[in-house]
Design a protein with these regions (language model features):
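Polar, S/T/G-rich
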Residues: 3-261, 268, 312-314, 319-321, ...
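Surface-exposed fibrous attachment elements
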Residues: 14-15, 279-281, 305
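Short, low-complexity, polar/charged sequence segments that are solvent-exposed and flexible
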Residues: 57-59, 113-114, 286, 292-295, ...
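Hydrophobic residues embedded in beta-strands of well-ordered beta-sheets
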Residues: 270-273
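Short, charged/polar, Gly/Pro-enriched secondary-structure boundary elements
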Residues: 279-289
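Metal-dependent DNA phosphodiester-chemistry modules and their immediately adjacent helices/loops
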Residues: 290-332
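Short alpha-helix capping/helix-loop boundary micro-motifs
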Residues: 376-385
Length: 390
């Protein structure tokens, strides 16, 4: 509909970035003021080193071996205790995301699996999924965040410097109003609900401000099973696998979530009602009895009209590096017809941070292109009866 087209155009503009956010989420940073991202769905990410220390001694306290720095690792055999610091061990607290998350697995060290033979006996780590009531120590809280506590034993053949670490994170657990339960999910509607209501990193809206009936309908539509391509496998209509940068505005992050599921969020009668764009039967017939103001019509413009759309997305099949999906395909009947009609290449490129499936990315490229070529909008002032078209 027209409302979803306008919302999509705003989100498209936000998706045109000069920087490469998708590649940046795999980078390790060192800071105590860096923003902590929110992970929805599943993504491979780097993290923020909030604690880095070297040591070569250990303490024995209460019969339990503890790292000198205060970490409490899983049980393992240690070298002989030394009275002289050797800086043989590097300790890192690597914050990955806001907690609580479902799981942190499949660690890679300098782009090699943690289990690689070159790292044998050199690395140990603890996983902290973190709910808001947990903390590391009384002095080092890290409360409410998901992080790794890691120890590296120095080996010049294995490590040329401070190791870069990435992990596969299944992110936030989400409340589902359809089942009144909380569990991990990659459903975009549930992600949007969480972002709108979360008081730590989201908008902090009261639950009463969300129409959970409408949101449940949207969530069910996102879960619809579709065939990804002729003769291919089936999958969900929409999923959300996003790393949200919490330094961005709430509006920008919400638009990122909405664009990935072709959603829009009208506000009516004191509540937000999530809608997922799609074909539907006509719901209202306008007559002159409903029109109480002037009519304005805006047609498509060359600056907003495309004959090729490229969507950049993080691809798990390419080790989560940025990949592209293009519509229409080069040499296709559609491309030939559009180029003949326009006489020049009109291309658009956007980044999608929520989609990690090639076929979902390609389908969204198709939808955005078709909308741009049928972008006539009409504005009229009407009676309150038209509110049912929200």
């Amino acid at each position: 509909g027209a409302a979803s087209y306008v919302a999509a155009k705003k989100a498209q503009k936000a998706a045109k970035r000069p920087n490469d956010d998708q590649r940046g989420v795999l980078v390790n940073k060192e800071s105590n003021i860096e923003q902590i991202p929110v992970i929805y769905g599943e993504r491979r990410v780097g993290g923020v080193r909030v604690f880095v220390s070297t040591d070569g001694t250990k303490l024995i306290a209460g019969g339990l071996t503890r790292w000198q720095s205060g970490w409490e690792p899983e049980s393992e055999v240690y070298d002989t205790v030394s009275d002289t610091p050797t800086n043989e061990y590097l300790y890192i607290a690597l914050v990955l995301a806001e907690g609580e998350v479902e799981s942190i697995t499949d660690l890679e060290i300098n782009e090699l699996p943690f289990t690689h033979a070159k790292y044998s006996g050199l690395i140990s780590y603890n996983v902290y999924l973190r709910n808001v009531n947990e903390f590391w120590t009384a002095d080092h809280r890290l409360r409410g965040v998901a992080f790794l506590g890691m120890r590296f034993k120095w080996d010049e053949e294995a490590f040329a410097g401070v190791p870069d670490v990435t992990a596969l994170v299944k992110g936030k657990k989400l409340y589902d109003p359809r089942t009144a339960s909380t569990a991990w999910s990659d459903n975009p509607a549930l992600c949007i609900r969480d972002y709108l209501t979360n008081t730590r990193y989201g908008k902090g809206l009261a639950v009463s401000a969300i129409d959970d009936v409408a949101l449940g309908i949207a969530a069910t539509k996102c879960d619809d099973s579709v065939t990804e391509y002729t003769g291919g496998a089936t999958g969900k209509l929409f999923t959300c696998n996003a790393v949200l940068d919490t330094s961005k505005t709430l509006f920008d992050n919400l638009n990122i979530l909405l664009l990935g599921c072709r959603g829009f969020l009208p506000y009516s009668q004191g509540q937000y009602r999530l809608k997922i764009d799609g074909s539907s039967a006509s719901q209202f017939a306008f007559t002159t009895d409903h029109i109480i103001g002037g009519i304005s019509i805006q047609g498509e413009s060359k600056s907003d009209k495309y004959n090729r759309v490229t969507v950049k997305f993080p691809n798990p099949d390419a080790n989560w590096q940025p990949d592209t999906a293009i519509w229409p395909a080069a040499g296709s009947t559609e491309e030939t017809a559009y180029l003949a009609a326009d006489g020049v290449l009109l291309q658009e490129e956007i980044e999608l941070d929520t989609i990690t499936n090639y076929y979902q990315a390609r389908d969204l490229a198709r939808i955005l292109l078709l909308r741009s070529r049928n972008g006539i909008t009409c504005g009229i002032k009407v009676t309150s009866e038209a509110l049912q078209l929200e």
